[in-house]
Swiss-Prot record:
[4Fe-4S] cluster binds at residues 67-68, 133, 162. GO terms for molecular function: 4 iron, 4 sulfur cluster binding; iron ion binding; NADH dehydrogenase (ubiquinone) activity; NADH:ubiquinone reductase (non-electrogenic) activity; quinone binding. The gene is nuoB. It comes from Buchnera aphidicola subsp. Acyrthosiphon pisum (strain APS) (Acyrthosiphon pisum symbiotic bacterium). Its EC number is 7.1.1.-. This is NADH-quinone oxidoreductase subunit B.
Length: 224
């Protein structure tokens, strides 16, 4: 049996069909688009506004492990003027910071302390791994050093070097600002139907691992 949907004529008060009641049927897809195009644009504008404020007001946590921390602090001097990027306000408490820079060698004894400080930071939060020791353990391939801080923390930006220069740290801030501006950062703790759960946030290395493995042609240093 074929069914035909007829739009009701509200002006005539259903005079065309006096013996039956006609229900007005609206297209749910059309209503969905009308509703969400407008609300979606407002949501996008709000997210862009929030991301703009976040990327220009980063609050790094005053936290260092070894020699790379000296290069990080050098970026806060008047020579480099990191205040141009809105991240010159070092916070003494993790509850007032949203960026953690792992500058130095992460020892196994320090890993639980770093994890606890990271958990106390504000949401959303970002992690910068600064230096070869923080990236992969560096030259300390021994039992007492964690071979990469991304073993227990989700890292967003990696800074190579031993130690990296302050300009490299400033370049990392620029990359972090682009990252914040382009994506909607999820919260680590999510409230769902089954209660509150911890969202797994993989590091940048894990996310790009398959793409890097499939690379056949390597780019020159000028194109990187």
């Amino acid at each position: 049996m074929n069914y035909t949907l007829t739009k009701a004529d509200s002006d005539n008060n259903n005079k065309k069909y006096p013996k039956q009641t006609i229900e007005s049927v609206s297209d749910p897809l059309e209503e969905y688009l009308k509703k969400n195009i407008f609300m979606g644009k407002i949501t996008q504008l709000l997210h862009k506004l929030v991301n703009w404020g976040r990327k220009n007001s980063l609050w790094p946590y005053n936290f260092g492990l070894s020699c790379c921390y000296v290069e990080m602090v050098s970026a806060f001097t008047s020579v480099h003027d990191v205040a141009r990027f809105g991240s010159e306000v070092l916070r003494a408490s993790p509850r007032q910071a949203d960026v953690m820079v792992i500058a130095g060698t992460p020892f196994i004894k320090m890993a639980p302390v770093i994890q606890r400080l990271y958990d106390q930071m504000l949401e959303p939060k970002w992690v910068i791994s600064m230096g070869a020791c923080a990236n992969s353990g560096g030259m300390y391939d021994i039992y007492s050093v964690v071979q990469g801080v991304d073993k227990f923390l989700p890292v967003d930006i990696y800074i190579p070097g031993c130690p990296p220069r302050p300009e490299a740290y400033m370049q990392a801030l620029i990359l972090l600002q682009k990252l914040i501006n382009e994506e909607r950062r999820p919260l680590s703790w999510v409230i769902g139907e089954q209660g509150v759960y911890h969202k797994k946030m993989p590091s940048e290395r894990v996310q790009k691992r398959s793409k890097r493995i499939n690379i056949i042609n390597l780019s020159t240093s000028e194109k990187i």
